[in-house]
A protein has these predicted regions:
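Short loop/turn segments that flank or connect secondary-structure elements
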Residues: 28-62, 71-188
Length: 188
């Protein structure tokens, strides 16, 4: 990566486990598309800041990309992704192994809120929160559109089969794990 000379250039490691709890496919009817096809689904009509908790949580597609470690180049400020996943990420389901206690176990975990989504610039372009923030539609593979939580995996959007655990990897070796696919592959 141009301008990324050594791990000593790293300003910090960014981790986030955001809304990657249990499968919420049918957890709450309020979060699901409306039964009346003439009506628009909530994500097209309700602003992010006005969504209920269940609506907000259902926007998470379960890709696990937000749970990848990221580094910042001190010289450029560029956020660079790694293929190293948070220690709590289940690599098969792409969900947090301890969603309820994630902040206690991973203090650097960031919670997505309507306010933080406005401020966080590193969300992947496939992320529903970022897409809706930017006035873009959900993509075809999103579980709210497909009705199937597995389409995120079938479309190759999730981190399944593409990541390693951060456990035991010193920050000095993060440079060996840099990847671009979290921000270049969207499934559009």
């Amino acid at each position: 990566v141009s301008g990324f000379h050594s791990c000593q250039k790293l300003a910090f490691v960014i981790q986030a486990e955001v809304n990657v709890g249990t499968d919420r496919k049918a957890e709450n009817a309020e979060a699901m598309p409306l039964d009346n096809p003439a009506s628009s689904p909530f994500w097209e009509t309700v602003p992010l800041a006005q969504m209920s908790q269940s609506q907000w949580e259902s926007l998470c597609d379960g890709c696990g990309r937000c749970c990848l470690n990221k580094v910042e180049d001190w010289d450029t400020g560029e956020i660079i992704w790694t293929d190293l996943a948070c220690r709590l990420l289940d690599h098969e389901s792409c969900r947090c192994k301890d969603y309820t206690n994630r902040f206690a176990k991973v203090p650097e975990c960031l919670q997505l809120t309507p306010q933080s989504v406005e401020e966080i610039t590193w969300l992947p372009p496939s992320c529903a929160y970022a897409r809706l923030r930017d006035g873009k539609p959900l993509l075809w593979w999103h579980p709210l559109l497909s009705g199937d939580a597995d389409t995120v995996h079938a479309a190759g959007i999730s981190v399944r089969g593409r990541v390693k655990t951060e456990v035991g990897v010193p920050i000095e070796e993060y440079e060996e794990h840099l990847v671009s696919w979290p921000v270049t592959e969207t499934g559009e």
